[in-house]
Amino acid sequence: LQGVVSSLPDPLNKSAMTSLPFRFEIDVPAGAGGLSGDTLKLAAGSVFQAQFQRRHEGGKTIIARGGLALNEPLRMADKGVLLAASADRLDADAWRKALAGNPERRDKASGAAAGSDGFPLSGLALRAGELRMLGQRLNDVTLRAVMEEGGWQARLTSKEATGEIVWRDQ
């Protein structure tokens, strides 16, 4: 991806002068012609990997299971998507903002988005030397979280805070 600029937060932020190998693959089961499902694989150098097993049902594409890895080995969830990340510094607020996208553009594209059931994040394994989250800075952070019925169950350890977190859907 030399010549391409990424304005994503670190560690996927890059200038046009920086080179970053990128790979994109779609594996379709033999004989199915991709009608029932496929596997999507992405990689950006050794920094980022993703893999999603997708089903195609009733005009919708559903992510059945997958994994996202940032400076970690790729692991797939049994159901939903597992995110594993480690970084010296990680700004969760910046990532949340970047992944939310432009609300105006998202509203205009709602017709196209209607065929999707969203991104089924089911688990999180995070390690960071410094984590910025919800306007706070935490150091030497380990965060493990799983989606349970009705919300998230998480365990956080850091220099500043340690404990269990339950985040309920409203």
Features from the language model and the residues they span:
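Membrane-proximal interfacial segments on either side of biological membranes
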Residues: 1-40, 51-170
